[in-house]
Amino acid sequence: KIPIPTHDKRFSGGMREVEQEVHRVQFLDPATGTGTFVAEAIQQIYDKMKGQQGLWNSYVENHLLPRINGFELLMASYAMAHLKLDLLLKQTGYTGTKNQRFRIYLTNSLEEYHKDTGTLFANWLSAEASEANQIKRDAPVMIVAGNPPYSGISSNNGEWISKLIEDYKYVDGEHFNERKHWLNDDYVKFIRYGQHFIEKNGSGILAYINPHGFLGNPTFRGMRWNLLKTFDKIYTIDLHGNSNIKEESPDGSPDINVFDIQQGVSINIFIKTSKKTESKLSDVFHLDLYGKREEKYQFLVDKSFSMIPFNKLNPEKPYFFFKNS
């Protein structure tokens, strides 16, 4: 059971907390945008339940919507996410019987929960923030996934996330003593944020697509060390496509980014079980994927996770690289 914010005009701020049972497996996209990752998660679940249409309505209301969470900072994207999910569920044949909202909230993921939210926002937004705070504080988030923003010059410099990032500046207890580094990039903060949720829960999966620089840049050695200590298994698919360094395929042919951006990107999956001990570092598995954009897309569509030919790495001091040397 966890405390859930509930509307009650008899209490200060019009809200009170009531203990309720929640599903143990909770999904969170901390940078939901227009809801693409959340929509795909719902679509995948629906596809597995085809042929059980009679159960779908009940499943959505009692077991799906209570598990799916998303945070978004921008009002326009937040509104679009709600519209996209509403249309998707209607297309699946879902017809709601309860007045149940999507658990997509207007909030900044990288800010810690605020206990006195009611004094900070207008009434309608106060309830929104209170429910987001409950997830930040209490929800047993076991899956964190998405495509968080990238920004080398981050404006998310709050005390809470900055303190968490400090952990990435140490390797085996020693500070890395660098003043110029890229640990303040937003995507690094979102990885640390997701890691924090999984650590707090004791087990879970963190899965992002984000810039690939942290895989092999020496300045990220403390970050890699910290991830090695936290997780049991780490899988990375380096999609390359970095036009900043004019990446090419090994055969000299063009290597194209999967997105219309200059930074190369990678798919990263971090898995933690309750059996993990800090003394044992994570196993790391890696794959390089070069070539045309369409070829990369096709590979990812055709291959199930078990079919991907990962290479096992052996990250070593002093840099603990997550890529082939």
Where does each model-flagged region fall?
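Sequence-level detector for compositionally biased, low-complexity segments
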Residues: 155-160, 164, 174-178, 196-325
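SAM-dependent methyltransferase catalytic region
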Residues: 1-236, 246
